[in-house]
Amino acid sequence: MIKFDDKQLNNIVEQDGDKHFFIETWGCQMNEEDSEKLSGMLKSQGYEETENRDEASIVIFNTCCVRENAENKVFGNLGRLKNQKEKNPNLIIALCGCMMQQKGMADEILSRFPYVDIIFGTHNAYKFPEYLHRVQVEGVQVKEIFDKETEIVEGVPIDRKSNVKAFVTIMYGCNNFCTYCVVPYVRGRERSRRPEDIENEIKELVSSGYKEITLLGQNVNSYGKGLEEEITFAQLLRRINEIDGLERLRFMTSHPKDLTLDVVYAIRDCDKLCEQIHLPVQSGSNEILQKMNRHYNKEQYLELAKKIREEIPDVTFSTDIIVGFPGETEEDFEETINLVKEVRYDAAFTFIYSRRNHTPADKMENQIPDDVKHDRFNRLVAAVNEGIVVGNKAAEGKIYEVLVEGTSKNNENKLTGRTRNAKLVNFDGCKEMIGKLVKVKIIEAKSFSLVGEVVE
């Protein structure tokens, strides 16, 4: 563990005039939390965040490389920044995140977009104030990518985007090497934070009024490996459940091969652990699962889901599914559809397979044509949505405890929040309810949300 050196914050040069920054984030919740830390470091030095990129004196793109589409968005946005840089030569453009960690990517960026000022990767984001200082004082272009993961850095300032719920990372990296995935290459090997550091962060959040914590990790079930103190993920959950003032606890992501029954029992037994599990299946075909290097088969996954439902009757499942993986036949795809119907997910992140350089799947034979991928994707989404509608319909007439998160995105006159099992609910109420737990009766089920009314 390394303690963040806050002295480097003192090196950020006071700029004349506007001190606004803009951060655009692509990718997962881990990236979102990384952006909150970048924002925290800048706000510690008097910078203000703006939602208007044209107003910013610092623009940061926190990138993702899980799919080609995310990379193309970065290239497109960089191209549009050229005019802004020409109008304001003092504009500082910084790129970070998983895309930058890929071999040769930083050099490609600087070749195509020479007006970029700072490039850094996933392992050294805590050094951003140092890089910014060098650009401001020395007028140099900074590119620094660490090939290997560093020790975990504690104490980095963080600017939370919500006053009600927060992400807390418990581990970094992944050791699984699924054949389609770049995460182990760009996020490094698994490293776990010390349990006392996690507990202290959560206690500080609770004392500041936060009600819900989501524990993050590429594979939270691997938590504890390599720590001096012997501790499992289930034991960590039970320890956090004892923190006074915490109302709700969630976690993601779980790998089906590593989700043990002691974690299931912890969810069953602990009053603060929410009845919701994100359990990526990726495919319902055993042949495809083997090609993906997932280390479980369809039967094992279904048995695990069945056991979870037996122990936690109100549980909801969400998942990740990829269609169009190399060699996927129509029969393989139909097995995925059948699994989706059997499990009946309450939410799903569905993806068309995207070839990624330097992954084994990219070199596999029988790559699927795009038109076939898109056809299967549309059929998958339809099957998933059918299950979601059934689950939402079953909620009608029931009363749920809802944590009020804020006003609805679609209607500022309505409040929005989630049930313990992660159902999104919109309802009428006063803004004083934000941050509180309220009882809501569901009066209407919509396709992807519920409509309710507050009950006394």
Swiss-Prot record:
Belongs to the methylthiotransferase family. MiaB subfamily. SUPFAM superfamilies: Radical SAM enzymes (SSF102114). CDD domains: Radical_SAM. NCBIfam families: miaB-methiolase (TIGR01574), MiaB/RimO family radical SAM methylthiotransferase (TIGR00089). Its EC number is 2.8.4.3. Residues 393-456 form the TRAM domain. This is tRNA-2-methylthio-N(6)-dimethylallyladenosine synthase. The lineage of its organism: Bacteria, Bacillati, Bacillota, Clostridia, Eubacteriales. It is found in: Cytoplasm. Catalyzes the methylthiolation of N6-(dimethylallyl)adenosine (i(6)A), leading to the formation of 2-methylthio-N6-(dimethylallyl)adenosine (ms(2)i(6)A) at position 37 in tRNAs that read codons beginning with uridine. Monomer. Residues 19-137 form the MTTase N-terminal domain. It comes from Clostridium botulinum (strain Eklund 17B / Type B). One of its GO terms (cellular component) is cytosol.
